[in-house]
């Protein structure tokens, strides 16, 4: 089924070129289908890239989804064309009276800051509180997962000695959740984090389940079944070249950055990386949309 996105959103042109089925919002209004309503709080500076990655995985399912994109009002993004935000994004105040089937909160490059030092922390916690009643199921990604975990459960992030960066093997720890239905026992996931959450602190919370983790990279996927909240600490939705762009960006800035592990063929950054995580990414997002967003609606 198609994903419904604004007619002129750059992501639509990219996905159409990949033969991904998209539908403009004007066309969608002419059909008699109730699409799942998913709101995405995009905190990334690379907004077009991130919205495209999320739209891509949500489009490749049997369920029709309409995306609503929002950005923070308390912090004005500086890396995105203001016209893009005006044309395709709303603020929280503009959508707070609506009900949504799903909420996705992205990561953000603010991992090493204390929570209260994040310009939009108060606004984010307001959105998280709003989601308790206004959203059926939530998916939090990377820093977004750490922020939601701290807000809802008081679990703090811990700073790593060095950035955890590369493509790491992960394994299923708990197969009871429909979120991991059909997953392989072991799978690869792109990781790009300066911080982590400690497993022992998660296990102390009876309502949280650790579904997948890595002996090298730590926790990957948590689930709060009762509250329909999914915490995803890594980036299965990443493109083939995302880690490459992050690596070259940090090198150009003179930041301390190691070669992403298990990513470039022969660890040679002059070679083109090969995607080995796409099927896991698609299955995870499909399961979330089906079992956490759609099926509770149909009961």
From Swiss-Prot:
Keywords: Acyltransferase, Amino-acid biosynthesis, Cytoplasm, Methionine biosynthesis, Transferase. GO terms for biological process: L-methionine biosynthetic process from homoserine via O-succinyl-L-homoserine and cystathionine. Substrate binds at residues 163, 192, 249. Its EC number is 2.3.1.31. The keyword Cytoplasm applies. GO terms for molecular function: homoserine O-acetyltransferase activity; homoserine O-succinyltransferase activity. The active site is at residues 142, 235, 237. It catalyses: L-homoserine + acetyl-CoA = O-acetyl-L-homoserine + CoA. It comes from the Bacteria. Gene3D superfamilies: 3.40.50.880. InterPro entries: Class_I_gatase-like, HST_MetA, MetA_family. The record marks 192 as: Important for substrate specificity. Pathway: Amino-acid biosynthesis; L-methionine biosynthesis via de novo pathway; O-acetyl-L-homoserine from L-homoserine: step 1/1. The record marks 111 as: Important for acyl-CoA specificity. It is found in: Cytoplasm. One of its GO terms (cellular component) is cytoplasm. Transmembrane segments: none annotated. Belongs to the MetA family. Transfers an acetyl group from acetyl-CoA to L-homoserine, forming acetyl-L-homoserine. This is Homoserine O-acetyltransferase. The lineage of its organism: Bacteria, Bacillati, Cyanobacteriota, Cyanophyceae, Synechococcales. The gene is metAA.
């Amino acid at each position: 089924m198609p994903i419904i996105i604004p007619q002129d959103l750059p992501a639509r042109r990219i996905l159409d070129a990949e033969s991904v089925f998209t539908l403009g919002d004007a066309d969608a209004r002419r059909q008699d289908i109730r699409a799942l309503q998913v709101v995405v709080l995009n905190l990334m500076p690379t907004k077009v890239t991130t919205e495209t990655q999320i739209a891509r995985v949500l489009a490749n399912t049997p369920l029709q989804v309409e995306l609503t994109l929002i950005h923070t009002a308390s912090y004005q993004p500086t890396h995105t064309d203001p016209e893009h935000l005006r044309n395709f994004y709303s603020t929280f105040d503009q959508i707070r009276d609506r009900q949504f089937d799903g909420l996705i909160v992205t990561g953000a490059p603010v991992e090493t800051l204390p929570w209260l030092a994040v310009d939009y922390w108060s606004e984010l916690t307001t959105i998280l509180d709003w989601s308790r009643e206004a959203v059926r199921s939530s998916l939090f990604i990377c820093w977004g997962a750490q922020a939601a975990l701290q807000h809802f459960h008081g679990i703090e992030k811990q700073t790593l000695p060095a950035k955890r960066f590369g493509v790491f093997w992960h394994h299923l720890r708990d197969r009871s959740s429909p979120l991991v239905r059909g997953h392989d026992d072991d799978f690869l996931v792109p990781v790009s984090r300066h911080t982590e959450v400690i497993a022992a602190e998660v296990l102390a919370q009876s309502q949280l389940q650790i579904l997948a983790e890595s002996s090298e990279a730590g926790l990957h996927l948590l689930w709060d079944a009762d509250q329909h909240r999914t915490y995803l600490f890594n980036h299965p939705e990443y493109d083939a070249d995302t880690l490459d762009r992050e690596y070259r960006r940090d090198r150009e800035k003179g930041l301390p950055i190691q070669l992403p592990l298990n990513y470039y063929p022969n660890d040679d950054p002059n070679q083109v990386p090969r995607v080995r995580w796409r099927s896991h990414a698609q299955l995870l997002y499909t399961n979330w949309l089906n079992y956490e967003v759609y099926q509770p609606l149909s009961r």
